A protein has these predicted regions:
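N-terminal glycine-rich anion-binding loop in soluble enzyme alpha/beta folds
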Residues: 5-64, 69
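Positions that flank functional sites
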Residues: 34, 92, 200
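A short glycine/small-residue-enriched secondary-structure motif
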Residues: 45-51, 74, 79, 106
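Glycine-rich phosphate- or other oxyanion-binding loops that anchor nucleotides, phosphorylated ligands
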Residues: 55-93, 98, 102, 149
Length: 292
């Protein structure tokens, strides 16, 4: 059995230190500002830079990673004898997954056998991080690339993603809400509760009014869906887009209710924050499978 090299796009919203500590290959992702491409590797651009840019009235966008970017990052490890398992943003949110699949096929055609596995995570942000972290545990247990790939496909829908946000304008810009909903949402202090569906797409579940109600709703949903309910003993990730105080408030609620959680980590949103805009808070945990 060949050794396994894990690979993940920067959309997982972890840290450079995490990748270095666990010897995981980080694939930078592209953010476009004023027609200039920036490669986000957690150093070239920062969340602070992104959100300050938005406050200046500029509208950053994202772009799918080129096929050759994946190929060039992976080929040297394949040549060194590794099999690779790569985790990327859901195919339901971006075309970058398809580019990764094509790069893997290029390598397969070149070397004559499958060496790069690209499961569709159907995840985003720290939902990807949950899966990556589990894959790293499996690698350390000595599992093969094909076994890790199989586990991800079988368990990916258990990675729960729940979001809320305070600003509808970026959802309107992305075509996810109508102009009427944007205006009413802002006027009525609506905080939508959103989640990932079975196709790995971001969908709205319900509306709440005010941040306190929204944060409580997120934690109540976690109690209903998390493995073990209040006895949940696995990792929890919280992300935010320029809304640290909101993330810390959710962290307090989770600590109060889930006293056995293995760890609770807060991270900045990178690429997903480009689409949701400032004011987003999200939670990620292992729990019941998404069914719709």
């Amino acid at each position: 059995m060949r050794p396994v090299k894990l690979s993940a796009a920067a959309t997982v919203d972890l840290t450079k230190e995490y990748f270095e500590k666990n010897d995981i290959l980080l694939i930078p992702t592209i953010v476009v500002i004023d027609d200039k491409e920036y490669w986000d590797d957690y150093e070239n651009i920062t969340p602070r830079f992104l959100y300050d840019t938005m406050k200046e009235g500029k509208l950053p966008t994202t772009s799918s990673n080129p096929i050759m970017s994946y190929y060039e990052h992976w080929k040297k490890y394949v040549d060194e004898g590794y099999d690779i398992v790569h985790m990327d943003l859901s195919s339901g949110l971006s075309g970058t997954y398809n580019n990764a699949v094509m790069a893997a096929k290029m390598i397969e055609d070149e070397v004559g056998e499958k060496r790069v596995y690209v499961p569709d995570t159907l995840a985003a942000s720290c939902g990807e991080a949950l899966i990556l972290d589990a894959a790293n545990d499996l690698k350390n247990e000595g599992k093969s690339a094909s076994e890790i790939h199989y586990w991800i496909v079988e368990n990916r829908l258990r990675a729960n993603h729940w979001f809320t946000l305070s600003d509808f304008s970026h959802l309107f810009r992305g075509g996810r809400v109508s102009r009427t909903k944007m205006i009413l949402g802002s006027a009525l202090n609506i905080y939508p509760i959103m989640r990932m569906d079975v196709e790995g797409k971001l969908v709205q579940k319900k509306n709440t009014r005010g941040s306190k109600k929204a944060f409580k709703t997120l934690v109540d949903i976690m109690e209903q869906r998390a493995d073990g309910g209040k006895d949940y003993n696995k990792k929890v990730f919280i992300t935010h887009s320029d809304y640290l105080e909101g993330a810390e408030e959710v962290e307090k609620l989770i600590k109060k209710k889930f006293k056995n959680a293995e760890s609770i980590e807060i991270h900045d949103l990178h690429q997903i924050g480009v689409h949701t805009g400032p004011g987003t808070v999200s939670i990620f945990f292992w729990g019941e499978e998404r069914i719709d």
